[in-house]
Amino acid sequence: MAAVLEAGSAGQFEQLIQNSAKSLTVVHFWAPWAPQCTQMNEVMAELAKEQPQVMFVKLEAEAVPEVSEKYEVTSVPTFLFFKNSQKIDRLDGAHAPELTKRVQRHASSTSFPATPNSAPKEDLNGRLKKLINAAPCMLFMKGSPQEPRCGFSRQIVALLNDQKVQFSSFDILSDEEVRQGLKTFSNWPTYPQFYVKGELVGGLDIVKEMVASGELDQMCPKAQSLEERLKALVNKAPVMLFMKGNKEMAKCGFSRQILEIMNNTGVTYETFDILEDEEVRQGLKAYSNWPTYPQLYVKGELVGGLDIIKELKESGELVSVLKGDQ
């Protein structure tokens, strides 16, 4: 089931959903005119190789309008997740790391997520506190920084980017409970909302004023360039392994093999899951001029991939290389 299937009609779509039995089915509602959809098709093709037990389906949203309307798909890309012919999750927008996360989560689960009545909900105020403190600067907006879904959100993202502010965001269109609850929690009725260190700064107009006065510049951390970020990551620990998955669970055969070798050396090392961050995944290939994963670094310098690690192990040099003796 490694290939991405295509549903060209409502009947074909229904048949694919019904035939998938208890396995996970991920449907990408896409459009050929949207470049972000083409990019996400490539991500799906990669995921199909990594998750052969999952069925991946492409459906051109405008070509099969009855299915798009049934599931209230109004923009592309949109991803729907099905099990036992029932929709269990939805993801709007081109968010490769989040798509990867959700596929992994649902693929590893053999049952449906708990229904709202079967388990107590996390206290909403507690959840909102966690969200507004999720990063030093948090923007609650419609859409994502890559794909804002209203003019005000687009303007505030442009302002923050112009000021090189490092911020994280939350798409309030993806969670109605957060969307309504945050209005009351912060006594602020509109979006976007910008928070610094868990405190509400305000909306677009206030952020504009703070940019003009220079206050925002003093208040918010500056975003690193990708090169600066990659340099910091490869130097995060003396020995850094960039892989698919983590120490507890490798998500490809090559990563699994290199973990076994590393664990047998007794040398302390840290890992970074490249499936969690598409920017790092692609950027590190160019940064180190090394096109594949896993990649192993010692003191910020690339050692190589699995084949080189195997060679170093066979020659008896691996431990001394990992300890920085060579």
UniProtKB/Swiss-Prot annotation:
<dbReference type="GO" id="GO:0051536">
    <property type="term" value="F:iron-sulfur cluster binding"/>
</dbReference>
<dbReference type="InterPro" id="IPR004480">
    <property type="entry name" value="Monothiol_GRX-rel"/>
</dbReference>
<comment type="subunit">
    <text>Homodimer; the homodimer is independent of 2Fe-2S clusters. Heterotrimer; forms a heterotrimeric complex composed by two bola2 molecules and one glrx3 molecule; linked by [2Fe-2S] clusters.</text>
</comment>
<feature type="binding site">
    <location>
        <position position="150"/>
    </location>
    <ligand>
        <name>[2Fe-2S] cluster</name>
    </ligand>
</feature>
<comment type="function">
    <text>Together with bola2, acts as a cytosolic iron-sulfur (Fe-S) cluster assembly factor that facilitates [2Fe-2S] cluster insertion into a subset of cytosolic proteins. Required for hemoglobin maturation. Does not possess any thyoredoxin activity since it lacks the conserved motif that is essential for catalytic activity.</text>
</comment>
<feature type="domain" description="Thioredoxin">
    <location>
        <begin position="1"/>
        <end position="108"/>
    </location>
</feature>
<keyword id="KW-0408">Iron</keyword>
<dbReference type="GO" id="GO:0044571">
    <property type="term" value="P:[2Fe-2S] cluster assembly"/>
</dbReference>
<feature type="binding site">
    <location>
        <position position="252"/>
    </location>
    <ligand>
        <name>[2Fe-2S] cluster</name>
    </ligand>
</feature>
<keyword id="KW-0479">Metal-binding</keyword>
<dbReference type="Pfam" id="PF00462">
    <property type="entry name" value="Glutaredoxin"/>
</dbReference>
<feature type="domain" description="Glutaredoxin 1">
    <location>
        <begin position="125"/>
        <end position="227"/>
    </location>
</feature>
<keyword id="KW-0963">Cytoplasm</keyword>
<dbReference type="InterPro" id="IPR036249">
    <property type="entry name" value="Thioredoxin-like_sf"/>
</dbReference>
<dbReference type="InterPro" id="IPR002109">
    <property type="entry name" value="Glutaredoxin"/>
</dbReference>
<keyword id="KW-0677">Repeat</keyword>
<dbReference type="InterPro" id="IPR033658">
    <property type="entry name" value="GRX_PICOT-like"/>
</dbReference>
<dbReference type="GO" id="GO:0046872">
    <property type="term" value="F:metal ion binding"/>
</dbReference>
<dbReference type="InterPro" id="IPR013766">
    <property type="entry name" value="Thioredoxin_domain"/>
</dbReference>
<dbReference type="GO" id="GO:0005829">
    <property type="term" value="C:cytosol"/>
</dbReference>
<protein>
    <recommendedName>
        <fullName>Glutaredoxin-3</fullName>
    </recommendedName>
</protein>
<dbReference type="Pfam" id="PF00085">
    <property type="entry name" value="Thioredoxin"/>
</dbReference>
<feature type="domain" description="Glutaredoxin 2">
    <location>
        <begin position="227"/>
        <end position="326"/>
    </location>
</feature>
<keyword id="KW-0411">Iron-sulfur</keyword>
